[in-house]
A protein has these predicted regions:
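C-terminal recognition in membrane/secretory proteostasis and scaffolding
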Residues: 1-95
Length: 95
């Protein structure tokens, strides 16, 4: 099973306001696991994950639906927002 190495949360209006996010798109990365695939790729806590391989993820369940399509060793392209700036990060999934 593929593993990205993050803890995530759905973004609701209250959380978006608290974190000064523009809207509720994506999922909030609440923690990046030490030595995990996401950490190695440069993902940080409080980044907002917008999409994986051009498929939008707007809930924890949508993210899980995307990740299970992949195997350890596969590379995925993630769009994230950090401080309001969109970035593209490539992550090699682990097991």
């Amino acid at each position: 099973r593929a593993y990205i190495g993050i803890h995530i949360a759905d973004i609701n209006q209250e959380l978006a306001k608290k974190l000064a996010l523009n809207g509720v798109e994506g999922v909030l990365i609440t923690d990046v696991l030490k030595d995990g695939a996401a950490k190695k790729a440069g993902i940080e806590s409080y980044d907002v994950l917008i999409s994986i391989n051009d498929v939008e993820v707007n809930s924890v369940s949508q993210l899980h639906e995307q990740i299970i399509k992949f195997s350890p060793g596969d590379e995925i392209i993630c769009q994230i927002k950090r401080n309001g700036i969109l970035q593209t990060i490539e992550i090699e999934l682990e097991s």
